[in-house]
Amino acid sequence: LLTVEEATSHWDCLDAADAIIMGAPTYMGSLSAPFKSFMDATSHVQYAEKRWDGKIAAGFTNGGSRGGDKQNSLIQLITFAAQHQMHWVGLGLSYGNNRSNTNDEILNRDTYSLGMVGQSNIDQGSEVAPPSSD
């Protein structure tokens, strides 16, 4: 597990990995600035030398709102993976909270298929948000 700040000092770990699972918070309908900076930093060597070609990729995001345009963040991650010729793997869970007999404790409660999405109330700390189902 690497933060984006750590990742830029450990390219060898990412280059040697069979899969890279990426995650970043969604702010204002987009990936966070530090993650975007990480993405841009891959263009000089990883992209130019196709070091991630053929790797498995997956991703997740978390935001303060139930919707919050998190789909856009997942699409950014998928596009980034595709630019590196990686193979994206979706969430693989059926839709969650879309029936009268389900609740917020069900997996994939916000019903995304491209990747994992979480929601954290902005007035609560990380000890309680996001909920364990996310």
Residue ranges and their predicted role:
Residues 24, 30, 64, 68-69, ...:
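Gly/Ser/Thr-rich helix-start
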Residues 1-51, 101, 118-134:
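N-terminal beta1-alpha1-beta2 submodule of the flavodoxin-like/Rossmannoid cofactor-binding fold
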Residues 108-120:
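Active-site-proximal catalytic alpha-helix in oxidoreductases
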Residues 53-111:
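Short, glycine-/small-residue-rich phosphate/pyrophosphate-handling segment
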